[in-house]
Amino acid sequence: MSGVRSPNSSMVNPKVMDLSIIISTRNRAQSLAKAIDAIAKLNISFDQIEIFVADNGSSDSTPIVSQMYANIFPHFKYIFDPRPGQLIGWHRALFESNGEILAFIDDDVRPTPDWAKCVLESFESPEIGIATGQIIPEFEERPPSWQKDMVLENNLGIWSALWGMLDFGTKIKEIPVDFVWGSNFLIRRKVMLEAGGFHPGGMPKELFHFTGDGDVGVGRIVAETGLKALYHPGAAVAHDLPANRNSSANEVKRWIFGEGLVTSYVLMRRLATANSTLTGTNLIDLAEDTISSTEISNIGRGYLNAESKLSDELDLLFRTCGSEGFRLHQKYFKKDALFRDWVLQPNYLDLDACYTHPDLLAI
């Protein structure tokens, strides 16, 4: 597509920035405006940062909102690419960015005033390749009582993957890479490129089976290199949770189903790497011997706390939705050669080379 810098681009960056802030968005102009408003209040010189709004095909007022803020920041760029998937915005902005440190945030988070300064502090040690900060949920309405079943506690602090909450206390500390999430995903640009970029992340509902392990996949690759992940409490963001996300079990259903898709995605990539001579059908047979039906039916239960007492409705969701997602992904992997190619891409940096499946091109 016009204007895309390829992974091997020789284009000289006009200016090396300290920090590139990348916001992936689609049809959430009001939420986006709140996020950029918060960025405008950061305690940092705007000459040190650049902001990218990566629009994944919005039909609302997102372009107008972006243009308004482009007049405020000296280094601001709006990227429009309607091809489906969060991966598009992530990687388009990655190759147009000039920051030594990259901050990928969602359009429903609002960085706190000292966030940018603390982001840069997080990478003072060369041993740190990836980082995050506190993620503070802000509910539009009081959440239902059953949500407490999905808030977990460990020796680091409290967290909830479903609700995007992370509170590991007031001290800077090393953490497992699995706790660096896309709502507040901080990484060295060099490390991101060496890791091969993101795996597929969020997808529209009708293409949900094309999702992958996204941000978490990058973290695990980074960890394999020996680099460490850091939690900096000052690199905090507020995470807006609207009432429609918390008033029913629909979000839980979508999330657990997605966990099933991701479980299959990760499994098939691992099996293909370990068994490079096997065909797609053979890999499916191998998958059936690798993961048990009990493991499949328990997909998502690792995100419940030990005292969980689920309602019958939620218990049914946890018993069925993860396995449904897993089976659907396996079905597509078995019958669709182009889908297999998508899942087994070495990396997704070259978007034009990766986006060949007809379903991903039917915009």
Describe each region flagged by the PLM.
Residues R28-K41:
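Short, well-formed alpha-helical segments that are part of the catalytic scaffolds
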Residues V180, P204-V218:
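Acidic donor-binding loop at a coil-to-helix junction in glycosyltransferase catalytic cores
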Residues E224-K228, G234-V237, S248-L286, G300-L304, ...:
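Catalytic core of nucleotide-sugar-dependent glycosyltransferases
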Residues L152-V177:
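Short, flexible, basic/aromatic active-site loop/helix in glycosyltransferases
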Residues A38, D55-I64, V109:
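A conserved acidic beta->alpha catalytic loop
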Residues L102:
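Short aromatic/hydrophobic "clamp" motif used to bind/position activated sugar donors
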Residues D114-V151:
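Conserved donor NDP-sugar-binding/catalytic core segment of glycosyltransferases
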